[in-house]
């Protein structure tokens, strides 16, 4: 009754309201940054930010397994994009040392990789960025509500103030809709005026923003949810070992590689018939012959849920 069901326009016209301001302030505090900016999706946050910050005179250095939204942002930016082998810091340094020191260089990485659940060595990336005068950008889509005490990869690696750009989503741990960017005030003010995916999109609904704000408050003020999540991760790790499945879990993403597309689909269908949703991930999302079942553990799962 107070805010209506829709936003009525883009953020720069009539779509902003006090709930946006409250959520963006809360996100900035949650990520230990000066300001934050909400986008309609995580995809739009990545595409809009990367394409706004770089052009054909600049360099982007990107992990080979980064999310499609990062890849598309690199393409739209027209920057010279150089790919380093997955989490390989020797390869990253070899690329950086051969680039002009004074040119704009942006190192971009997922923090938790969506298909394997492994964690980027953000501390080493930050060190190399400082050494070679590069900016750093981390996508915390799968780390917010997971790493550290729930605040994400920067907290996990104790890098507050040392990562230039933090991105995240409101649709995973926060169970709402949207994405966000957090960083210095000058960064956010620049994106407000330059990020086309922000400028030319109707704003999120008040219900989306209000639910995100409440969910963020729960994570920020109650560590028990993150503790329960890691209890569940440990429980699943034990179950996998008991069944001779050798996977070392560090996050809630559990990839069970079956190689064959058909086998992945068949297993997923049989599980679905037993009321278990386990996604069959196939090319082009993963490489050929790397089809898998991806289990996503949450704090809301009971041991009975997980012991299927």
Please identify what each model-predicted range represents.
Residues 3, 25, 29, 273-274, ...:
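PLP-dependent enzyme catalytic core of the Aspartate aminotransferase-like
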Residues 207-227, 238-241:
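Amphipathic alpha-helix from the class-I
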Residues 49-68:
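Conserved PLP-anchoring active-site segment centered on the Schiff-base-forming lysine
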Residues 227-234, 241-275, 285, 289-290, ...:
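Conserved PLP-binding catalytic core of the aspartate aminotransferase-like
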Residues 54, 85, 89, 101, ...:
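Pyridoxal 5′-phosphate
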Residues 3-41, 233:
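Conserved N-terminal alpha-helix of the aminotransferase class I/II PLP-enzyme fold
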Residues 82, 86-138:
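Active-site phosphate-binding strand-loop segment of PLP-dependent enzymes
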Residues 155-190:
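Active-site PLP attachment segment
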């Amino acid at each position: 009754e107070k805010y209506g069901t829709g936003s009525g326009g883009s953020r720069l016209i009539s779509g902003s309201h006090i709930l946006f301001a409250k959520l963006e302030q809360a996100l900035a505090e949650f990520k230990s940054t000066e300001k934050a900016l909400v986008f309609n999706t995580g995809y739009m946050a990545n595409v809009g930010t990367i394409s706004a910050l770089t052009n054909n005179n600049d360099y982007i250095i990107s992990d080979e397994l980064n999310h499609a939204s990062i890849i598309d942002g690199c393409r739209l930016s027209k920057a010279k994009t150089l790919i380093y082998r997955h989490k390989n810091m020797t390869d990253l340094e070899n690329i950086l040392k051969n680039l002009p020191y004074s040119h704009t260089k942006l190192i971009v990485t997922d923090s938790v990789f969506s298909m394997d659940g492994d964690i980027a060595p953000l501390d080493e990336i930050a060190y190399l960025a400082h050494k070679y005068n590069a900016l750093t950008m981390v996508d915390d889509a799968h780390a917010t509500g997971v790493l550290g005490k729930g605040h994400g990869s920067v907290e996990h690696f104790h890098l507050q103030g040392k990562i230039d750009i933090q991105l995240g989503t409101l649709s995973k741990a926060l169970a709402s809709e949207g994405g966000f960017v957090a960083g210095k005030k000058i960064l956010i003010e620049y994106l407000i005026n330059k990020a086309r995916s922000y400028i030319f999109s109707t704003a999120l609904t008040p219900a989306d923003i209000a639910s995100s704000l409440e969910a963020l408050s729960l994570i920020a003020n109650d560590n028990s949810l993150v503790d329960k999540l890691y209890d569940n991760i440990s429980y699943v790790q034990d179950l996998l070992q008991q069944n001779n499945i050798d996977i070392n879990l560090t996050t809630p993403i559990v990839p069970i590689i079956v190689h064959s597309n058909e086998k992945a689909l068949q297993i997923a269908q049989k599980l679905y018939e037993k009321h278990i949703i386990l996604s069959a991930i196939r090319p082009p999302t993963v490489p050929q012959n790397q089809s898998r079942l991806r289990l996503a553990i949450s704090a809301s799962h009971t041991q009975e849920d997980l012991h299927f």
